[in-house]
Curated annotation (Swiss-Prot):
Protein name (database record): Ion-translocating oxidoreductase complex subunit B
Name of the top EC class for this enzyme: translocase
Subcellular location: Cell inner membrane
Domain 4Fe-4S ferredoxin-type: 108-137, 138-167
Subunit and interaction comment: The complex is composed of six subunits: RnfA, RnfB, RnfC, RnfD, RnfE and RnfG.
Region described as Hydrophobic: 1-26
Protein EC: 7.-.-.-
Protein source organism: Pectobacterium carotovorum subsp. carotovorum (strain PC1)
PANTHER family: ION-TRANSLOCATING OXIDOREDUCTASE COMPLEX SUBUNIT B (PTHR42859:SF3), OXIDOREDUCTASE (PTHR42859)
Binding-site residues for [4Fe-4S] cluster 2, renumbered to this chain: C117, C120, C123, C157
HAMAP family from the UniProt entry: RsxB_RnfB
Annotated TM spans: none
Function noted in UniProt: Part of a membrane-bound complex that couples electron transfer with translocation of ions across the membrane.
Amino acid sequence: MSTIWIAIAALSALALAFGLVLGYASRRFEVENDPIVEEVEAMLPQSQCGQCGYPGCRPYAEAVALNGENINKCGPGGEAMMLKLAEKLNVDPQPLEGDADVQAPARQVAWIDESNCIGCTKCIQACPVDAIIGSTKAVHTVVSDLCTGCDLCVAPCPTDCIELRPIAPTPANWKWDLDTIPVRVIQVERHA
């Protein structure tokens, strides 16, 4: 019985010693991160889709914060996220595609033709934001509120039953073209 207690005490002392050494090493060799990079990364949608030309949201955040990369390359974040980045970094807002003459594309979401879906789950595995629900050998469907339109689920589908479709306009996502609305000032005559 005493050998068990000796073994427990020895392992506990060893664990304590390793814990102290690792704790000291983590404090001593800590790498300082740029807080601006952390804030920019927190603002990005974290879909890791690669539409910006970088392998994920962290490298894009580093390029924006440290190298002055354009803030208009994140497709899933859209115009709202670009405006937040512009305000945070004190830069001028940029058109989403980088060209003022090009109209920003309508937001699209994945759509699954459920009559052709074989339930292989390849699209579920490819989706970085878990916007596709379903199980093996069952029909899958897309939760359009979660879908970022990154297009990563389309290629793995063996039956080509997934396509991107534009979102139908609703009062929540409608963009008013304020330039075409005529504004007239009507003079009011006051009678005494």
